[in-house]
Each structure stands twice: as structure tokens, then as C-alpha cells.
């Protein structure tokens, strides 16, 4: 097992592509590309709208990317994208930034013994290069890296709650698994739509061949329309920075920069031609999952519970038109996520020494 080092995401792009087969988060790959390609476009909005992230953004630029790649004769086994720290003794796994809910190494689909060997080789190389400690933000507690770290000197600083919805084939099985109260709320929303004579439509677009494509001027215009719903929901949090907040969420955030793009999707619920709810994010084909860092509802249609209907419509559509069987709603354990059949899981803020234990 050999370990190579690259000083940019672009330089390691081939290896990064090779190591997405074992369920590694699609967010990591897609957003890293957006960060490196469009950093200066992001910075003004990020620094002004999210002051607590400004230092992270600036340091991201000042600490260039470094990517370690473990490979054997069959190809890349593991990729470790880092932000190289200026003091040389501390690095964070790249992706610790606004709206990214998973941060981890990228693993190829290989036997566990090969992944273990690659992990130890990469950590040893980091230690040789003077990186004494490494940090993960939002590391999945039941993931591959977390299982390796159980035998490694490490500390968990904070735990975050996340929710994913796993559904069977067909909408009927999903609905039967919901609580009586959840089914009643969905039924009430549908009845209100019928009584009020509302026309409801659902659409799904992706760049991975599921649903309609995401290219073209029409799609870009549609994205501006549905993102305005998200902006309106966020503006109340940033009243003193209204224009900057709008520019950031429409154009400068990492989700905005990486969707549309490789591995991206958008699902939208419309009522009488207006956006009632939408979600956007990434398709993780290895996990057969949607990763959803951004979901928003239009308050104008609040009486119809558009967010709940969006999830139900998405489950029905995905069951019939794809092999996706998980909608990962990521960080946050809001009640509506659990009512819709969500399952709690944890991500952690972790620090570890790079020195390989005996």
C-alpha cells in the first residue's frame, strides 16, 4: 500500500472519483469541488452573513488543500482531503463549512482488511509529514472511520442529532409504517387541497439520470424561483444583512454552488403553479440515498403542510422511478422529520492523534 500526497482537489480528482463506491458521502466530493473552484465568490457573502464561519472561510483559503491517497495495484483505496494548518501540527478534514453535514475520508468498495491497511498507512504518512492531530466535524458515528477510531487515541467533543427516512418499495408500505396521527395529518392536508380546488404537482430533477435533467436556461430560472422560498425563510434570521443574506443563499453558499452539478438533485412541490416546498442536495448512488442539506416550505401554503406532502410525494415517486430508498434529512431532529418515519442517528465532532498505535 503506497500513499501519495496532492496539494489540490483538482490534482487528486481522479482518485476522489475512484473512492466514492463504499457509501462515502456525495456531499463531500461535490462541495469540495465547489469550495476550491469558487472560493472567492463565496467568501464575501459567507463572511458577512455568517460571521462565526468567516474565520473558517479565510483559513480555508490560507491553508491550502492537501489530499492523501492510499492506493494499491488495483487503484485508489482511500482519499483523505484536508485543510492544511499553518502551524503544521493540526489539520481538519476538508468540508467543515456552512451547510455540509458529513465530513469524512472517502473509501473505495474494498474488503475491510484493505480499508484498515489504507487508513493506517494514511495516518502514518500524516504523522511523518508533521500533522500530529486531525479533526472531523460531523463524522458519522456508525461509519467506517468511526469504527477504525475505536482502537485509536481520540476524543469526541460534541454529538449532533440527524434524521434519515428509510422506506420500502411502494407508498402503501411507507404509509402503513407511519403513526395514526401522522397519517391523519397527511390526510387532512390532502382534503384541504381538494376542498380549496388546488392543483398540486411534483417534479424531480437530477444530474445522475433519475428524473429530468438539470441543464439549460429553464432549469436555472426555476432554481432562482424555488431558492427564493428558502431565502425568505432565512431572511428573518439575518434582518440586518438582508441583501447580503439573499445574495449568499442564492449564489454564494456551497449548496448553491454545487447544485446543479455532479451528483445533485432537486425535488419540488407546486400548488397552483407556485413553489410550495422544495428540497435540494445530492444523490448518493452507493447508499441509494438522497442527502438533503436544504429543505424549505412556503409559508403562504402553510395550511396544506407542504413539507410533509413533499416528502410523501418524493417517497412515492422514488419508489416507482428509482432504486433510492433513503431520504437523509441530515442535521436536526425536528418533530416533522420524526413524524414522517425518520430514524435518529448521530454525527460527532472528533479529534484524533495521527500516530499509529502499536
For each predicted feature, which ranges?
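Acyl-donor binding region in acyl/amide transferases
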Residues: 85-158, 287-344
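Short capping/connector residues at structural and topological boundaries
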Residues: 110, 180-183, 341, 349
